[in-house]
Structures are given as structure tokens and as C-alpha cells.
Amino acid sequence: MKENGELVHFFRDKNYIMVNNDLGSGSFGKTVVLQDPFIDELFVAKKYEPYYEDDRKAFYDSFLQEIKIMHKLNHQNVVRIYNYYAYEDQYTGYILMEYIIGESLPDYLETVCTLGDYGEIDNLFVQLIDGFQYIESQGIVHR
């Protein structure tokens, strides 16, 4: 048995099934949908893999900082981070996040605006502001 303060290393690899290999992408990587076959749950995985190779090492510490900050957040209007996988020797990694079922925000807004449901737009706006107020109350500035 390990003593308090000693590092505990888990040997089992965690495997996921790729459900959607192209949920989204940006200048610092892409997002995919994975399924944990053991608990039968979907997750979004954000892979840190900058488009430019020179950026990989330069922004890796920012990626790790994002993990630390986001993992502390717990609010109904902020996507939850459940786990992370950091590969420091390769300057890459993954953030495993809550998967929210539904259409993309732009598609949803287009549908709501087309229907003229301005009450729903107001409701969505209130939820957005509520989430940002929580983030700001935690001393975090969203960019």
C-alpha cells in the first residue's frame, strides 16, 4: 500500500470507440465524439494538435493551463471536463468533455429565428450570460 503523498500509477489503458471523427476543428486541433464502451457514455474529446508544428511546443503550457482552469468549473451552463490525457514528450494531449446531445448552436439559432420564437432566443441568451457570469466569478476571462 502506498503512503499518503506517494504517486499512484494506474496501468490500465483507457480505450474509447470513435463515433464522430469530425465534430469540429480549429487552429489548435480538432474535436471528436468518443464512446466509453464500459459505461456506454459519449464524450467529446478535444485534441491539442496545432495546425503549425512550430506552435505545438510554444502553446502546450497554455493547453495544460486550460485543463487546470476548466476542470475546476462546475455550472449547468458550462461544458464539464471529466478527464484529460497529456503527452508531454509529444506536446499533445486530449481533454475529455461532456457531450451534449442536440444540434449545433448556429443550426439551433437558425431554426429558432426562422420560427420567430424570440422567447426561446431570450431564454438562450439568459443561459449564456449566466454561464459567463459564473466563469467571471471564478476569476477567469474567456477569450
Q: What role is predicted for each listed range?
A:
Residues N20-S27, T31:
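Protein kinase glycine-rich loop
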Residues Q35-F43:
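Conserved N-lobe loop of protein kinases adjacent to the ATP-binding glycine-rich P-loop
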Residues K46-Y51:
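Conserved beta3-strand ATP-binding lysine motif
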Residues D55-K72:
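AlphaC helix of the eukaryotic protein kinase fold
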Residues N83-Y85:
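A short, aromatic-enriched beta-strand patch in the conserved N-lobe beta-sheet
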Residues D89-S104, Y108:
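Conserved short submotifs of the Hanks-type protein kinase catalytic core
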Residues L124-F125:
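Activation segment signature within eukaryotic-like protein kinase domains
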Residues D130-I140:
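Protein kinase catalytic-loop region centered on the HRD/HxD motif
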